[in-house]
From Swiss-Prot:
Its EC number is 6.3.2.8. Pathway: Cell wall biogenesis; peptidoglycan biosynthesis. It catalyses: UDP-N-acetyl-alpha-D-muramate + L-alanine + ATP = UDP-N-acetyl-alpha-D-muramoyl-L-alanine + ADP + phosphate + H(+). This is UDP-N-acetylmuramate--L-alanine ligase. The gene is murC.
Amino acid sequence: MMSKLDNQQLAKIRTMVPEMRRVERIHFVGIGGAGMSGIAEVLLNEGYRISGSDLAPNAVTDSLTQKGAEIFFGHAAENVNGASVVVVSTAIAQDNPELVAARELRIPVVRRAEMLAELMRYRHGIAIAGTHGKTTTTALMTQIYFEAGLDPTFVNGGLVKSAGTNARLGCSRYLIAEADESDASFLHLQPMVSVVTNIEADHMDTYGGDFEVLKQTFIDFLHNLPFYGLAVMCVDDPVVRELLPRIGRQIITYGFSDDADVRIVEYGQHAHQGHFTILRAGKPDLNVKLNIPGKHNALNATAAVAVATEEGVDDDAIIRALLEFEGTGRRFDHLGEFETGNGSVMLVDDYGHHPSEVDVTIQAARAGWEKKRLVMIFQPHRYSRTRDLYEDFAHVLEQVDVLLMLDVYSAGEVAIPGADGRSLCRTIRGRGKIDPIFVPTHEDLPSVLANILQNDDLLLTQGAGDVGKIARQLADLQLDIAAMRAE
């Protein structure tokens, strides 16, 4: 899937953004995050000097260092010395010493999305937005374009497994990018094609707690398209459907709905593989096999198909790409089948942290492995989200057979009374369907699992915090309870 660019191709790419030739060194504050690291990697491959800082090393910073970036651990004013521009993520506080120093030195400070917008400015940009499904849809579209020989640049919010990275510099005019609505920074982007997968109440602090403001922001995002641009929108989502009359751009809709322009029919699932047919006006029906489970992933794939079809990608390339798709990191990530006593347990890790995301993950697990007992380790993400969606979480989580509840991963937030894992556990228990177990520390998990796991269980680790590290620890130890206790 990947090829290395030669010097001539790199020189051609550098001419795409002529004014960026004035820039020598680009410094990223918070470079270890998925969104920041992707842009840093593309710019590094374009030949720019890249530096960055983060609190601690991780696999991402190790990879960037190997590719030539200079990484500092800890934030210090001197880290920005010599930088032409400083790029910041929304997680960085305004009193961060590197931001303070950059302002004092009159070094331009830009947000992540502004730098992504510069990468997109002279390319054919395809931006994927929505509350859920952005990362997988971006990865699917990337796979299709590679299979068609179009060699796109891509910047994704998660690992594209077939590429082994979340970002890559291509030599064509196409740039496929995940567009982040969490801080409304996707309004900086000016793509040629925009996808909206769905719209739900999330990151509401950004929008003053007003859902109408969030909806208007998505409308504004779509109106950043040129008049000849294309909006691809999921008509199954009630909020997206509501907004359709307010969009003054060409629209193609997709979904299971009868009135979708690009429509899914005859969906079925066997274990990890979904199979369905996509109907398109004036085009042959596409009989699709997709190696990731769930109707939500059929929707993600159909969004990618709608864009690819509109841009003339060959049907055979589309079908091959979807069949060969390996998935994205931490999205129903099958980590293995592990022997435990008299049988085996299937381990799956998933990033979903909104009630709707957790719900579709549960449904995918039930559809593909209906005879397995579903055991979930759930880690709530952010106190504010837990508070705002408390009853929705309680309703969704009671659908599993066994629930192990961790405490909230704060993501830097101050604790909110009553919006914690123990309280949520108590509420779910009071609803009477299941008897969840609150696990106060990660170190307590092995002994709890030793008493819980049974032959042929499906163990699902769920959440956007460090529960993913727990999943990989469990996989590394092959669910050996004794070994986990020793750890």
